[in-house]
Amino acid sequence: MEMTNAQRLILSNQYKMMTMLDPTNAERYRRLQTIIERGYGLQMRELDREFGELTEETCRTIIDIMEMYHALHVSWTNLKDTQAIDERRVTFLGFDAATEARYLGYVRFMVNIEGRYTHFDAGTHGFNAQTPMWEKYQRMLNVWHACPRQYHLSANEINQIINA
């Protein structure tokens, strides 16, 4: 992340204020303030992750994934025989915190801040699937989009989607 000295000074002052406003996270803010003030390039890359960007297309894809899981769960609930498919298979897991942190952050934002998909169970890991999921979700979306009745899926269609 490239910043002018003026930008670094402003950000440093922001971190200084945050240490006073949020004492529980003061150490974290002091550390970030030091990194910014001294211009430690390697550690400043952490800010790239914090201030990263998701394109509109990526955000829409994540919402589409969440909507697919909503449709899967609704369809599963409407099945006469729900025993044939384990409910965990139609439960949204989230994304991997280690490799898909930006996607995970967006999911948490959508649920916790925007109040969408609040019926999703965050589990004990807060939607951290602990394994990369993006490619799997892409395959699932392709199958789901090909279904004629996306919110009234049969057991066979549900199985095709979750096994994609």
Swiss-Prot record:
InterPro entries reported in the protein's UniProt record: UPF0304_YfbU, YfbU_alpha-helical_sf, YfbU_helix-hairpin_sf
Signal sequence segment: none
Disulfide bonds: none
Protein origin, superkingdom: Bacteria
Family: Belongs to the UPF0304 family.
NCBIfam families registered for this protein in UniProt: PRK05445.1
Protein name per Swiss-Prot or TrEMBL: UPF0304 protein YfbU
Species annotation: Salmonella typhimurium (strain LT2 / SGSC1412 / ATCC 700720)
Lineage of the organism: Bacteria, Pseudomonadati, Pseudomonadota, Gammaproteobacteria, Enterobacterales
